[in-house]
């Protein structure tokens, strides 16, 4: 956690390393939760599903998978771009062969933290924009 500047003599506030909010600070409960669309990458055996959701916890829980590989910020436009990018690996629907190229892409997206840590950061940034 990083120190946040305070008045002289005060103990510095600490920022959460995941979401960036000051530890103990809670967003106003009356604020609407911001919509944060993500493209998700779920592995099941030797296939990877590339999909999108504005409610990733619910969506990921509803799909049988072995591993959540990554999230990236984006909506259906980004999802369609990824489907086109990896079309040569398509197995059917939104499922793609877990080829080294696709796995490397997911690994790059996941660098620096878990998918849920990335998502928490994006939600925190969206909340910060609504209160600024």
Summary of predicted features, one role per range:
Residues 1-132:
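Non-catalytic accessory segments flanking enzymatic or RNA/DNA-binding domains
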């Amino acid at each position: 956690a990083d120190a946040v500047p305070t008045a002289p003599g005060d103990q510095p506030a600490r920022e959460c390393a995941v979401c960036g909010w000051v530890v103990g600070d809670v967003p106003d409960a009356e604020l609407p939760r911001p919509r944060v669309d993500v493209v998700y990458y779920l592995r099941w055996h030797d296939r990877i599903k590339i999909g999108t959701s504005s409610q990733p916890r619910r969506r990921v829980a509803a799909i049988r998978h072995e591993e959540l590989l990554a999230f990236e910020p984006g909506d259906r436009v980004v999802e369609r771009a990824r489907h086109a990018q990896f079309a040569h690996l398509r197995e059917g629907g939104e499922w793609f062969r877990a080829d080294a190229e696709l796995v490397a892409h997911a690994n790059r997206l996941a660098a620096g933290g878990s998918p849920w840590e990335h998502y928490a950061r994006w939600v925190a940034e969206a909340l910060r924009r609504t209160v600024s």
